Amino acid sequence: MRILGIDPGLRTTGFGVLEKHGNKLAYVASGTIRSNGETSLPERLKTLYDGISEVARTYAPDCAAIEKVFVNVNPQSTLLLGQARGAAICGLVGQGLPVFEYTALQLKVAVVGYGRANKEQVQEMVMRLLSLSGRPSSDAADALGVAICHANGGDTLGTLAGLAPELARKGMRVRRGRLVG
């Protein structure tokens, strides 16, 4: 199975492609799609849409996994990120791909084993898990990480509801839309 992972962003969207053969993961490609901050928002969204569509056509994945939007302190940033994510999802669905969604917590637990891992830890573990010769950019590492999350059975944890029984056993609960322990 070939999986395309996406880390959405308005300035920089990361992508990562990997193959899953049984329990083995193999790196195929990764990179970033950048939009020009000098252009209008609709033009930037079109750049992301076109870039994602091209990546999907080039690497012909069987499915896509994308990171869910987190709620930022700045509502304007959250709205812009949501629009970039929407453009990415449209590009994926436009290529006929099923799209699976994962939170940053799910990604970090799948890759590092710790939900509060920092970007450097995610980069390092992605490099090790996929036997890469160099460290990928943080955007590409997150995209590869979300693909790894999906490859390792993340599709059964696609929603917070899928995680709820395990989290409850660990003393965690949802409060005001956030996970607390």
Swiss-Prot record:
Q: Where in the cell is it found?
A: Cytoplasm
What general EC class does the enzyme of this chain belong to?
A: hydrolase
Cofactor(s) recorded in Swiss-Prot or TrEMBL: Mg(2+)
Residues at the catalytic site: 7, 67, 139
**Pfam families referenced in this protein's UniProt entry, alphabetically:** RuvC
**Cofactor binding mode and count:** Binds 2 Mg(2+) ion per subunit.
Which Gene Ontology CC terms are recorded?
cytoplasm; Holliday junction resolvase complex
According to the UniProt entry, what is the EC number of this protein? Answer: 3.1.21.10
This protein's record includes keyword Lipid metabolism: no
Where is Mg(2+) 1 annotated to bind?
7, 139
Q: Mind telling me which CDD domains this protein's record contains?
A: RuvC (cd16962)
Which reactions fall under this protein's catalytic activity?
Answer: Endonucleolytic cleavage at a junction such as a reciprocal single-stranded crossover between two homologous DNA duplexes (Holliday junction)
Gene3D superfamilies the record matches:
Ribonuclease H-like superfamily/Ribonuclease H
- Annotated residues that bind Mg(2+) 2 are located at 67
| GO MF annotation list | crossover junction DNA endonuclease activity; DNA binding; magnesium ion binding
The subunit field of the Swiss-Prot or TrEMBL record says: Homodimer which binds Holliday junction (HJ) DNA. The HJ becomes 2-fold symmetrical on binding to RuvC with unstacked arms; it has a different conformation from HJ DNA in complex with RuvA. In the full resolvosome a probable DNA-RuvA(4)-RuvB(12)-RuvC(2) complex forms which resolves the HJ.
Question: What family is it from?
Answer: Belongs to the RuvC family.
Known function:
The RuvA-RuvB-RuvC complex processes Holliday junction (HJ) DNA during genetic recombination and DNA repair. Endonuclease that resolves HJ intermediates. Cleaves cruciform DNA by making single-stranded nicks across the HJ at symmetrical positions within the homologous arms, yielding a 5'-phosphate and a 3'-hydroxyl group; requires a central core of homology in the junction. The consensus cleavage sequence is 5'-(A/T)TT(C/G)-3'. Cleavage occurs on the 3'-side of the TT dinucleotide at the point of strand exchange.
Please state what the protein is called. Answer: Crossover junction endodeoxyribonuclease RuvC
Q: Which organism is it from?
A: Cupriavidus metallidurans (strain ATCC 43123 / DSM 2839 / NBRC 102507 / CH34) (Ralstonia metallidurans)
Lineage of this protein's species?
Bacteria, Pseudomonadati, Pseudomonadota, Betaproteobacteria, Burkholderiales
